[in-house]
């Protein structure tokens, strides 16, 4: 693009699309409890999985991963350089983490980062997804899987999509920052697992 205005518009559009939290909208549509008010209070895939099960969690993952794709498709159609595509992708992640609405209470940006990587560095996205799935299965803890995938992403990018390594590193840094509290809880042994929470039944009279 020759003018900075369309680039600014794409970044703004990315932030606004990122601000649409999949967990909130999916749970509202299905009549489920708002994940910001239960469990870990994080509006993301893992908390929805613990609270409401596989189907709402899968829908949340799909929405959060897909919301970056339209604006990045436009950026690629306009032949923006990789750093500019990265800026647009980052705006989606910032929107998800610090949304315009929902009182600024966003998610950890893992699913959204997966969607951004699918558009910018597709092989890296799949390597990180595989890493996440294996570690989530072994550790039963989403934070462990997410932290490992975030640390792996720049290395995988250097190997598979070297031109995107810098922007992928920025994405990873944001995900790590968003997991600061999880890192503390892991150190204290208090990080919740991925197992669905059991509903407490009222005592029988």
From Swiss-Prot:
Localization: Cell inner membrane
Reactions listed under catalytic activity: an acyl phosphate + sn-glycerol 3-phosphate = a 1-acyl-sn-glycero-3-phosphate + phosphate
Main location: membrane
Entry GO MF terms: acyl-phosphate glycerol-3-phosphate acyltransferase activity
Annotated Gene Ontology cellular component terms: plasma membrane
Pathway(s) it belongs to: Lipid metabolism; phospholipid metabolism
E.C. number(s) listed in UniProt: 2.3.1.275
Enzyme class: transferase
BP term (GO), one: phospholipid biosynthetic process
Superkingdom of the organism of origin: Bacteria
Keywords tagged on the record: Cell inner membrane, Cell membrane, Lipid biosynthesis, Lipid metabolism, Membrane, Phospholipid biosynthesis, Phospholipid metabolism, Transferase, Transmembrane, Transmembrane helix
Transmembrane portions of the chain: 7-27, 54-74, 80-100, 116-136, 141-161, 163-183
Subunit structure: Probably interacts with PlsX.
Entry similarity comment: Belongs to the PlsY family.
The protein's role, per its UniProt record: Catalyzes the transfer of an acyl group from acyl-phosphate (acyl-PO(4)) to glycerol-3-phosphate (G3P) to form lysophosphatidic acid (LPA). This enzyme utilizes acyl-phosphate as fatty acyl donor, but not acyl-CoA or acyl-ACP.
Name listed for the protein in its UniProt record: Glycerol-3-phosphate acyltransferase
């Amino acid at each position: 693009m020759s003018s900075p205005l369309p680039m600014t518009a794409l970044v703004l559009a990315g932030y606004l699309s990122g601000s649409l939290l999949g967990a909130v909208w999916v749970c509202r549509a299905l009549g489920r409890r708002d994940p910001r008010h239960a469990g870990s209070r994080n509006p993301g895939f893992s908390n929805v999985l613990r609270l409401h099960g596989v189907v709402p969690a899968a829908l949340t993952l799909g929405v959060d991963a897909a919301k970056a794709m339209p604006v990045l498709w436009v950026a690629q159609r306009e032949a923006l350089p990789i750093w500019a595509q990265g800026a647009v992708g980052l705006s989606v992640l910032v929107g998800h983490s610090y949304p315009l609405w929902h009182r600024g209470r966003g998610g950890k940006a893992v699913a959204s980062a997966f969607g951004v990587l699918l558009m910018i560095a597709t092989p890296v996205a799949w390597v990180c997804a595989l890493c996440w799935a294996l570690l989530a299965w072994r550790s039963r803890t989403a934070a462990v899987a997410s932290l490992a995938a975030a640390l792996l992403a720049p290395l995988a990018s250097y190997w598979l999509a070297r031109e995107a390594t810098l922007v992928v590193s920025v994405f990873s840094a944001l995900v790590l920052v968003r997991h600061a509290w999880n890192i503390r809880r892991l150190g204290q042994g208090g990080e919740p697992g991925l197992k669905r929470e059991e509903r407490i039944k009222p005592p029988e009279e």
